[in-house]
Structures are given as C-alpha cells and as structure tokens.
Swiss-Prot record:
GO terms for cellular component: cytoplasm; endopeptidase Clp complex. Pfam families: CLP_protease (PF00574). NCBIfam families: clpP, PRK00277.1, PRK12553.1. This is ATP-dependent Clp protease proteolytic subunit. GO terms for biological process: protein quality control for misfolded or incompletely synthesized proteins. Fourteen ClpP subunits assemble into 2 heptameric rings which stack back to back to give a disk-like structure with a central cavity, resembling the structure of eukaryotic proteasomes. It comes from Limosilactobacillus fermentum (strain NBRC 3956 / LMG 18251). PROSITE patterns: CLP_PROTEASE_HIS, CLP_PROTEASE_SER. Its EC number is 3.4.21.92.
Length: 196
C-alpha cells in the first residue's frame, strides 16, 4: 500500500491541501523513487516538461532513489533532461543503481550531487530472450548495442575512458557518494545543505 502524505498550506485566502509531491513540484523538486518503468518515466517526463515551460531559467531538482529498471523508460527521461533548457540538478538519496546511475550522472555538469551515505552502482544491462535461435540472436545483439550506448553515456558523463567504463561495468560496481565524485559521476557530496 502506497500512502502519499498530504500537507496543508495556509495563505491569506485560506487553507489548501496538497499531496506532498504536488507541493514539492511547486518548488521545482521532482522525486524519482522506485523502479524505472514506463508509467514512472511518463510522469517524470511530464514534470520536467511542465517545469521547463513554466520557467526555463530556473533549475529543476531531481532527487533519485532507485534500483534502476527498464532502459527504454530511463532513456525517455535522459533524452528529456537533455532536451529541455532548464538545468537539471540531480541528487542521489539512498541509491542510484543501474539506469538510475545513468540519470544521476546526466544532470547538469557541476550540479550532480549525492547525500553522504548514498550509493551509486553501475553495471551492464541485463536481459533475457527465448524463442527461435534467430530471435535470441537478435535480442543478444540488441543487448550489446544497449550496453555500448550506456557505457558511452557513462564515459561522457564521468570523463573516464570507454574502456575503463566497460571494464568497471562488467560486474556490479558499487560506489559511495565520495567514490562517485572521484570517478566523475557526481560533482559533490551534500551535507546539511553544504558541499564537501
């Protein structure tokens, strides 16, 4: 059961109740939490487009706590982050793993952060196939293309060589927030609204 808290805001015109996510959106904050899939991606994309249309000169704050998920859904968010004019500040809270690590590293350079005890995990995409041999071969080739694309993005975002990223994503590669900064996936560690 997913309960969404409600907040009450008082103004000169009276009281107004918001679900917490709508209230955060007023402050240009988007929460990306849980597995990345089509419905979530559509919601994140819509929020990014709305905030950019509202005022493209102000930053959008994308807080991420996700184990990753469907690559095509994540790429819809990634492409939108790069399409809009607003700078997108990314902040890892908890974990940004798999596709979520690609998103957190794709924030505006200089504005990619992690909280002190957050974790970033990079690895190769996973997938499966069944059916005729030719269908399995097509699926395997698609996974290899996807892996190359993800590794190219991680290399571009981190400043690491493609070969280094390819080696590091061979298996699950966990990084603390500071290690993610050292690797180039993040720009700083946030602590009590201050950067380390």
């Amino acid at each position: 059961m997913n309960l969404v808290p409600t907040v009450i805001e008082q103004s000169s015109r009276g009281e107004r109740a918001y679900d917490i996510y709508s209230r955060l959106l007023k402050d240009r904050i988007i929460m990306l939490s849980g597995p990345i899939e089509d419905n979530m991606a559509n919601s994140i994309v819509a929020q990014l487009l709305f905030l950019d249309a509202q005022d493209s000169t102000k930053d959008i704050y994308l807080y991420i706590n996700s184990p990753g998920g469907v690559v095509t859904s994540g790429m819809a968010i990634y492409d939108t982050m790069n399409f809009i004019k607003s700078d997108v500040q990314t902040i890892v809270i908890g974990m940004a793993a798999s596709m979520a690590s690609v998103l957190v590293s794709s924030g505006t350079k200089g504005k990619r952060f992690g909280l002190p005890h957050s974790t970033v995990m990079i690895h190769q995409p996973s997938g499966g196939a069944q059916g005729q041999q030719t269908e399995i071969q097509i699926a395997a080739e698609e996974i290899l293309k996807t892996r190359k694309m993800i590794n190219e993005i991680l290399a571009k975002n981190s400043g690491q060589s493609f070969e280094q990223v390819e080696q590091d994503t061979e298996r699950d590669h966990y990084l603390t927030a500071q290690e993610a900064v050292d690797y180039g996936l993040l720009d700083g560690v946030m602590d009590s609204n201050n950067l380390k």
